[in-house]
Amino acid sequence: MTVLIHVLGSDIPHHNRTVLRFFNDALAATSEHAREFMVVGKDDGLSDSCPALSVQFFPGKKSLAEAVIAKAKANRQQRFFFHGQFNPTLWLALLSGGIKPSQFFWHIWGADLYELSSGLRYKLFYPLRRLAQKRVGCVFATRGDLSFFAKTHPKVRGELLYFPTRMDPSLNTMANDRQREGKMTILVGNSGDRSNEHVAALRAVHQQFGDTVKVVVPMGYPPNNEAYIEEVRQAGLELFSEENLQILSEKLEFDAYLALLRQCDLGYFIFARQQGIGTLCLLIQAGIPCVLNRENPFWQDMTEQHLPVLFTTDDLNEDIVREAQRQLASADKNTIAFFSPNYLQGWQRALAIAAGEVA
């Protein structure tokens, strides 16, 4: 049997590194279909830190796409698992037959599914991508994204799968030792990416709570984002006093980020799509409820796991937030499907499906 090849077709260092390390640490030892990767980006020590993997790096999207298409044409039994498919050339290859449906398996990350960009080239490309998506052999995604995808592509097979968030299961009870009282601290957004709509989110928080809460905005990723960070800072200072606004412009190490989250009382995410599942997982693990846009279908995954969900359209106050905290504190976090290690079973099944080992 031909070994499955995994494709990270865009240079998204943080997410690509997370996927590679997860495969190296959790999957490669038990499956030959978890070892071969084609990745856009620089090595930057990844080969050394992932010795169980065979990783081929490419300088750009086009060079990787050309290599994938060549492999697909040379051997029609070769199957590919695309993780977060942001590479237009690969969509066009699927649409034109360069890659066959039986060769194309896609793990939806969220941003690669929704049509939120307003630029002309995106508006021209989206209809073509939609046509190509009808030809995918199987999609893997969160429950909410599967539901969203099925509305337009009901005939494409869908399987539940969660991004492998880096988590320590021993911290599932860490919320129990924190006393929550006094001024609330609210985390706004999951990164410095513009998709978080930071300014609109800050205005929404201010409309709900006024200048009575402390707002923390993590913007250390992506790099070279100083102009946008300053734009958010100025907008924030028009709404909140300086002591109540904390803009984090430096990237935090994982342990420091965990410590930051533990100081929060609420996460506030205004974006109208599924994204930031890593931050949501870590907040929920710490017993911190999240406010979501109703258009973000991840609320379906949360309710399926019997977790409280607050919405941006709700009338929020401290009593409501504290009640959601109480409900989270009483939830059995060891059974949550999108937590580590529970998502591992889904990955093992996904590998078997994509490799053709199970129907």
From Swiss-Prot:
Stated role: Catalyzes the synthesis of Und-PP-GlcNAc-ManNAcA-Fuc4NAc (Lipid III), the third lipid-linked intermediate involved in ECA synthesis.
Record Pfam families: Glyco_transf_56
Protein name per UniProt: TDP-N-acetylfucosamine:lipid II N-acetylfucosaminyltransferase
GO cellular component, one term: plasma membrane
Metabolic or biological pathway, per its Swiss-Prot or TrEMBL entry: Bacterial outer membrane biogenesis; enterobacterial common antigen biosynthesis
Keyword Cell membrane attached: yes
Superkingdom of origin: Bacteria
Originating organism: Shigella flexneri serotype 5b (strain 8401)
